[in-house]
Amino acid sequence: MESVIFSINGEIIQVNKEIITASPYNFFKRIQDHHLKDEAIILNGINYHAFESLLDYIRWKKINITINNVEMILVAAIIIDVPPVVDLCVKTMIHNINSTNCIRMFNFSKQYGIKKLYNASMSEIINNITAVTSDPEFGKLSKDELTTILSHEDVNVNHEDVTAMILLKWIHKNPNDVDIINILHPKFMTNTMRNAISLLGLTISKSTKPVTRNGIKHNIVVIKNSDYISTITHYSPRTEYWTIVGNTDRQFYNANVLHNCLYIIGGMINNRHVYSVSRVDLETKKWKTVTNMSSLKSEVSTCVNNGKLYVIGGLEFSISTGVAEYLKHGTSKWIRLPNLITPRYSGASVFVNDDIYVMGGVYTTYEKYVVLNDVECFTKNRWIKKSPMPRHHSIVYAVEYDGDIYVITGITHETRNYLYKYIVKEDKWIELYMYFNHVGKMFVCSCGDYILIIADAKYEYYPKSNTWNLFDMSTRNIEYYDMFTKDETPKCNVTHKSLPSFLSNCEKQFLQ
């Protein structure tokens, strides 16, 4: 019986000529006359056992492909040109892609020009980008490859600070390509992260390119009242859809977003004060009642920082309280802070670096009702007085922007709205031009390079130029409005000394 001899890494395989002749594959057609010669056909780049598996497939139309042998069989099938086996191997690899092997499969697909595997592995990287940064192969991605990944509209990052941490980890392995940092959009980053990058000696150029990462764009949550039942809706920039999350029957509550959950704090139900806090996951729409606060109260002030929800002051029946406490997301124990110097409700609270600032509101007892202008700062585990606001205000809204505080006041006893800037380093207040007037309740949040105000219409205030934009928007019956990103960078004063600790904390929070 005539045979064709193959040599693979010094090992010999003799194959019946009839198998070669009957094969429909081009590789075997080209060597059908080679058996007339005495020398063996040398096959390079093919595993001996993989070639045996291909011969079994050619003879019996059966092949044993596992996750352990799929790559070597696929390489052999590509070189020998056996398309059915190539397809089987590619399907096996795609079925077994995960965050720990997707970069290796991505590189494999490029090496052998396998488009389906390339697309599948790229999709896995895009969906699990924060996890794949732990892969030793991550640092070997080229600059162009990482740029393509991070520029994809569906790349799974929820904040531009996360993108920054991904880039910093890659730059650590590729110090000659620091200019990749220019794919960042600084207006979507926190001041803290921008300062950290500056301390590293990196400069982000002003980008005129459109924002492609949908995940870094602001989510929106709205609570709208109708017949004493308020409906909660959520807008996702990744899906571009509004979805109804649920309902609440509370009044005089406060709300805040932390780790993609909406917390509804205190308030009243059927004219009765409550001390419960409800939490709804904005993705799963699942509700949970978290541990009660220390007392029954409404009209509290809230702020969030570093994974913690802070609740300050409030109204306990008819008396203002100075209680300050916080709850870490995912835990069940409220931690008490020292009480405010002046109890109050309806004030504003905001973080600047590691410090809490509380301002305005109302101090009330059974005998007194005092509208406040004083400002307190919680720093180094104690409250201290700061320069008071220029006027007394019972309704105050405050946001941090570029290390300072911007305050917009509502009206009750006041005759008009005011806009102030508090310069933190100078402990100084200045009054700025106010675009609108005679608005009581509103919602204020910082959105990159502008401050968004939802009042009788939608306003954008640009602090750097002290200019305003006005947009038509129906604001009727809105009880709460907030724009947010899904991850919260720790707010702290980053210095050269604290920079390593800050970056380490961010890496643990964002990339693990």
Curated annotation (Swiss-Prot):
Keyword Repeat: yes
SMART domains xrefs: BACK, BTB, Kelch
Superkingdom field: Viruses
Protein keywords: Early protein, Kelch repeat, Repeat
Annotated protein name in UniProt: Kelch repeat protein C2
Entry annotated with the keyword Ubl conjugation: no
Kelch repeat extents: 216-261, 262-307, 309-354, 356-403, 405-449, 452-498
Protein family (similarity comment): Belongs to the poxviruses Kelch family.
Domain BTB: 2-67
Pfam families named among the record's database cross-references: BACK, BTB, Kelch_1
